[in-house]
Amino acid sequence: MAKNIQAIRGMNDYLPSETAIWQRIEGTLKNVLGSYGYSEIRLPIVEQTPLFKRAIGEVTDVVEKEMYTFEDRNGDSLTLRPEGTAGCVRAGIEHGLLYNQEQHLWYIGPMFRHERPQKGRYRQFHQLGCEVFGLQGPDIDAELIMLTARWWRALGISEHVTLELNSIGSLEARANYRDALVAFLEQHKEKLDEDCKRRMYTSPLRVLDSKNPEVQALLNDAPALGDYLDEESREHFAGLCKLLESAGIAYTVNQRLVRGLDYYNRTVFEWVTNSLGSQGTVCAGGRYDGLVEQLGGRATPAVGFAMGLERLVLLVQAVNPEFKADPVVDIYLVASGADTQSAAMALAERLRDELPGVKLMTNHGGGNFKKQFARADKWGARVAVVLGESEVANGTAVVKDLRSGEQTAVAQDSVAAHLRTLLG
């Protein structure tokens, strides 16, 4: 007997019992994006490997350890996208969307990283990202954060996420800080773990993000990034903070927040939660004003963020159980008796025409009334429309409210109007 083929570790199937809540959450997110005037862009899952090496940075964990890279039949090195920003910038340059233009874009889809699978973090995971091009003031940074705050309110999780902010300054300011940080770390090398020693010269700002308690204690005496900011970055950050305060959005300045990708400058932010066990990031982003030019385009200011949907779904389910999936079926059409099926299917099509927003399922495979009503319950239907031989003969149908048990005989021409009243 052939061995069953199973899904790859860390790449999950999402079954109908799970996708319904995903659809409702994604619908909520997309509605808010539409209310801000953002447009969807759809991007390839596979890109040329040099795109990510140039955008993310060759000495980052993502590029060094986590990318799914392979050679195609033409000998080209290709990579399954580990994040969405690089591909979005590439598309913007390629199609002439960016130079001297303003773009407000969003995308959604699977990303791939070869990490150790754990709760809320998988090798194939789903992200929703937002990218804005052509605007350099702190007001657009603030709008993106306000947009995310509106998401949390719509999903009922506002009390379970907190905002952390930082400014990592200009490239020049960061280079000066990097030198000071490396000098400090060299003086205390014996207190660093092996991972921090490796990062000390390749990506020293990532040491600030270490989860090692001993390293974190050491960093209390390290030079502060805020002391090395250029004046323009200070003004930008102060403007952002003022806008958030005016909007009533609470935040904490975290001077060790640097983000794991090399393309960021100035504003960086994360929404974090403690409601899934250990602290986890729900949504994160920042400015990347140099990335478009770095990838071959003309200098264009840019800011954006990305959010992992697996972790967001877990959070909504954990803290807001009242946020339930929409029912799969609103109306279940029950038909029993000789020659009733064709009449039932014709009525179902007419009702779909007259009630386009309603989800209606027709019973197939026969069965007595008891079995068919059991199927209606299984699918979560609120109402059953019943056709038997007598109803077909006299042009009526029975409409039954499956919650109250009340039922009414209605002329078939009036069924849609009756259902509209019943379903509200």
Curated annotation (Swiss-Prot):
Catalytic class of the enzyme: ligase
Gene3D superfamilies: Anticodon-binding domain, Bira Bifunctional Protein, Domain 2
Pfam families: HGTP_anticodon (PF03129), tRNA-synt_His (PF13393)
Keywords associated with the record: Aminoacyl-tRNA synthetase, ATP-binding, Cytoplasm, Ligase, Nucleotide-binding, Protein biosynthesis
Reaction equations catalysed: tRNA(His) + L-histidine + ATP = L-histidyl-tRNA(His) + AMP + diphosphate + H(+)
EC assignment: 6.1.1.21
InterPro entries for this protein: aa-tRNA-synth_II, aa-tRNA-synth_II/BPL/LPL, Anticodon-bd, Anticodon-bd_dom_sf, His-tRNA-ligase, HisRS-like_core, HisRS/HisZ, HisRS_anticodon
Localization, UniProt: Cytoplasm
Main location: cytoplasm
Record-level Gene Ontology MF annotations: ATP binding; histidine-tRNA ligase activity
SUPFAM superfamilies given in the database record: Class II aaRS ABD-related (SSF52954), Class II aaRS and biotin synthetases (SSF55681)
Cellular component annotations (GO), alphabetically ordered: cytoplasm
GO biological process, one term: histidyl-tRNA aminoacylation
Assembly, per entry: Homodimer.
Similarity-based family: Belongs to the class-II aminoacyl-tRNA synthetase family.
UniProt cross-references to PANTHER family, sorted A to Z: HISTIDINE--TRNA LIGASE, MITOCHONDRIAL-RELATED (PTHR43707:SF1), HISTIDYL-TRNA SYNTHETASE (PTHR43707)
Protein name listed in UniProt: Histidine--tRNA ligase
Organism per entry: Shigella dysenteriae serotype 1 (strain Sd197)
